[in-house]
From Swiss-Prot:
Residue span(s) of domain Acylphosphatase-like: 8-94
Enzyme class: hydrolase
Hydrolase recorded as keyword: yes
The name this protein goes by in its record: Acylphosphatase
InterPro entries, alphabetized: Acylphosphatase, Acylphosphatase-like_dom, Acylphosphatase-like_dom_sf, Acylphosphatase_CS
Signal peptide feature range: none
UniProt family annotation: Belongs to the acylphosphatase family.
Gene3D superfamilies per the UniProt record, alphabetical: 3.30.70.100
Keywords of this entry: Hydrolase
EC number(s) on file: 3.6.1.7
Domain of life: Bacteria
Catalytic activity: an acyl phosphate + H2O = a carboxylate + phosphate + H(+)
NCBIfam families: PRK14424.1
Amino acid sequence: MQDPNIETLFIIVHGKVQGVGYRHATVRRAHMLGVTGWVQNMENGTVQAMVQGSPDQVDHMLEWMRRGPPAASVTELESRREDGGRRFKHFAQH
């Protein structure tokens, strides 16, 4: 049974988000907030992430990802709720 206190979001970040430390900064922020999941660069220039945690933790992470680190320029952020039983143990950069 899915834990109602755990939320999982799949996120796609568009803009100047590669070559600017976005993934590394995302991992640092995830550790600060206590969320789990992963982040990776995609061939089309976007960054994708899976973020899992309490609704409050996930909201704070999403808010940060809309801005990213200082060198990034996020133009669009897509997110969708994932309904799956997979639980992540840590936050990883791929």
